[in-house]
């Protein structure tokens, strides 16, 4: 039985004061961590405030990015070693905004996955196709290839413990959600790809999220699908009541 994992991705929104206020508003009403994992991914500058506010609560903390080197002359980058020392649990990698705007390659993302595991954190690895790719009938092949490249060299144990987020680019921040069936279809492809690369035991363990205009009104239906174990949520994760509705999808 895979534990549900609902993660907010605040992107470049919120400041430390808003972060503290947000966590104070939700912390008493989070589901128990052993039933559903509630995670917030925040900008690096907000992580100290987030970690402080989340102490002793059922909330886990994600960074939205990190570099693949631990230290050195890499101006402006964030070290995975430092994130681990700070107490960060998850790091989101391969988000389409990072692939598109910051030109991150499959190879960069794969190196980040290795660095995150080396530093005792868990990657939330994102994949997903553009509208053009979908309309060309190549969504399955595209996503399967991203997963294959992203997981290169990772051990079966590492992959079993990680999270893969399927986020069709055309559904991000557009209000256009993939239907629950469309989301399930590609999440199943992700799981089959993991089974081919490793084996069915690993595929049965890896948790797969759907992301793209998830909101309280559609989360239950999406979470009801066989291969969907969680959500990676942008817009609807930035308001406390909405975040609580999301993490309590099965109440
Ligand atoms: O990482 C989150 C996704 O990009 C989804 O964003 P959204 O929920 O605002 O569509």
Curated annotation (Swiss-Prot):
- Pathway(s) of this molecule: Carbohydrate biosynthesis; gluconeogenesis; Carbohydrate degradation; glycolysis; D-glyceraldehyde 3-phosphate from glycerone phosphate: step 1/1
So what EC number does this one have? 5.3.1.1
Q: Note the superkingdom of the native organism.
A: Bacteria
- Which residues does the record give as substrate binding sites? 9-11, 173, 213, 234-235
- What are the GO BP annotations of this UniProt entry? gluconeogenesis; glyceraldehyde-3-phosphate biosynthetic process; glycerol catabolic process; glycolytic process
What InterPro entries does UniProt report for this protein, alphabetically? Aldolase_TIM, TIM_sf, TrioseP_Isoase_bac/euk, Triosephosphate_isomerase, Triosephosphate_isomerase_AS
Reaction(s) catalysed by this chain, per the record, are: D-glyceraldehyde 3-phosphate = dihydroxyacetone phosphate
Question: Per its UniProt record, what Gene3D superfamilies does this chain match?
Answer: Aldolase class I
The annotated active site, in chain numbering, is 95 (electrophile), 167 (proton acceptor)
Localization, UniProt? Cytoplasm
UniProt entry keywords in alphabetical sequence: Cytoplasm, Gluconeogenesis, Glycolysis, Isomerase
Which EC class does it fall in? Answer: isomerase
Which GO CC terms are listed, alphabetically?
A: cytosol
Q: Drop me one GO molecular function for this one.
A: triose-phosphate isomerase activity
Q: What is its main location?
A: cytoplasm
State the HAMAP family in the record. TIM_B
What interactions and quaternary structure are annotated?
Homodimer.
Q: Which family does it belong to?
A: Belongs to the triosephosphate isomerase family.
Give the protein's function: Involved in the gluconeogenesis. Catalyzes stereospecifically the conversion of dihydroxyacetone phosphate (DHAP) to D-glyceraldehyde-3-phosphate (G3P).
Q: What is this protein called?
A: Triosephosphate isomerase
What is the phylogenetic placement of the source species in the record? Bacteria, Bacillati, Bacillota, Bacilli, Lactobacillales
């Amino acid at each position: 039985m895979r534990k549900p994992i609902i993660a907010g991705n605040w992107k470049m929104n919120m400041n430390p004061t808003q972060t503290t206020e947000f966590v104070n508003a939700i912390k008493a009403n989070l589901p128990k961590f052993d039933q559903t994992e509630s995670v917030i991914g925040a900008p690096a500058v907000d992580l100290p405030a987030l970690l402080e506010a989340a102490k002793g609560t059922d909330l886990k903390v994600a960074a939205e990015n990190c570099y693949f080197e631990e230290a050195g002359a890499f101006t402006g980058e964030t070290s995975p070693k430092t994130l681990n020392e700070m107490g960060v649990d998850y790091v989101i990698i391969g988000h389409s905004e990072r692939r598109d705007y910051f030109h991150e390659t499959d190879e960069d993302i794969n190196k980040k996955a290795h660095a995150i595991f080396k530093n005792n954190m868990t990657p939330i690895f994102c994949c997903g196709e553009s509208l053009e790719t979908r309309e060309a009938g190549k969504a399955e092949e595209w996503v399967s290839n991203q997963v294959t490249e992203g997981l290169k060299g990772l051990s079966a144990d590492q992959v079993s413990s990680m999270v893969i987020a399927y986020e069709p680019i055309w559904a991000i921040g557009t209000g256009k959600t993939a239907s629950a069936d469309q989301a399930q279809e590609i999440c199943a492809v992700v799981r089959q790809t993991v089974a081919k690369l490793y084996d069915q035991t690993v595929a049965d363990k890896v948790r797969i999220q759907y992301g793209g205009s998830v909101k309280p009104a559609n989360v239950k239906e999406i979470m009801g699908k066989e291969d969907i174990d969680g959500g990676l949520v942008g817009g609807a994760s930035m308001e406390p009541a909405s975040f609580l509705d999301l993490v309590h999808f099965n109440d």
